[in-house]
Amino acid sequence: MPLLHLLRQNPVIAAVKDNASLQLAIDSECQFISVLYGNICTISNIVKKIKNAGKYAFIHVDLLEGASNKEVVIQFLKLVTEADGIISTKASMLKAARAEGFFCIHRLFIVDSISFHNIDKQVAQSNPDCIEILPGCMPKVLGWVTEKIRQPLIAGGLVCDEEDARNAINAGVVALSTTNTGVWTLAKKLL
């Protein structure tokens, strides 16, 4: 089954920033885990724990310590991990990830109207499978983005409670990515 279809059926992505939150995510109902920590020496074991739990692993490559902003890090991740996807703010990294067969998530920060109006250009360069918009607690803006681009959206950052989660889903996002363990418990409730 295509990963995007599975994501729609499991709309809460547990974002983890340390080993403690990784274990909580593995024990949660969330089927997708975004790894926001680690380094080139530990990432293989982090992903292995996720895969051994039968879950999907996305690596935020920009946050991986010891890795450069060069495309060779994507080849490295393909060789040493079984990750399913790559998250990045950089189009060049996502192009390299696509070439290696990874599911690609372009993370974009919308802080003003200029960043909103530049979304099309950035997405055209990266051609991702999904776009993660931060902060994810802006339902009006999320709605504008869903009308502007064809790729499915993930709401990330500052999704603090069930109200934020439902507002984002109602605005048209396919999933939420959050470090908030309280929102993780909504994994099946949001369907």
UniProtKB/Swiss-Prot annotation:
UniProt xrefs under Gene3D superfamilies: Aldolase class I
Pfam families: G3P_antiterm
GO biological process: glycerol metabolic process; regulation of DNA-templated transcription
Domain of life: Bacteria
InterPro entries per record: Aldolase_TIM, GlpP
Protein family according to the UniProt entry: To B.subtilis GlpP.
Protein name according to UniProt: Uncharacterized protein YgcP
